[in-house]
Amino acid sequence: IRTMLHMPRIQKLWEEKYGQASTEEDVEKLYGLFEEKLMSILDRFAQPKPYVLEVVKELRARGIKIGSTTGYTDDMMAVVVPKAKEAGYEPDTWFSPDSVGHVGRPYPYMIFQNMEALHVSSVEHVVKVGDTVSDILEGKHAGVFTVGVVEGSSEMGLTEEYDALTQEKKEEKIEEVRQRFQKAGADAVILHMGEL
């Protein structure tokens, strides 16, 4: 919210509506409203993305541990974790910014917390898979192999909107997101989790 309010277009609209620049108090108030609304609907958005359950099953069959990082708070995860488990997804560990002094992505600390909890001795044994530029940056800052996932990503937009595009437009959008991930430093970019 703070970042958005610093965007010139949004700040200009704010000033037109309220007659003054936004303040830190405004940021806190907006975040409180956002969090309240999000908490009221969060349980509807805990379904694993396509191919995740199949990939997790294969990784576990190979003895690979799964740690997760999130931008959600612990309170939000208290809603998401049980719903995701009901749907069949349960990582071995997960960490939110609450676990690392409220310093989330793109900082690497949640990855390091996962490594410690899972007894992983080297960043060379870690693959970070994510669907945002912040995920990619988090992985790169941690020094781990980092994979960007295009379809279903926040960078791509809503699935329904994507599905409505022509094949040509889909390919353009895929390439745009692929380039964003590569520019952020992704070691690999895959179309969907099934390619992992």
Question: Which residue ranges define each predicted feature?
Answer:
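Asp-based, Mg2+/Mn2+-dependent phosphohydrolase catalytic module
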Residues: 53-61, 73-196
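Structural motif
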Residues: 69-71
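Metal-dependent phosphoesterase signature
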Residues: 5-51, 62
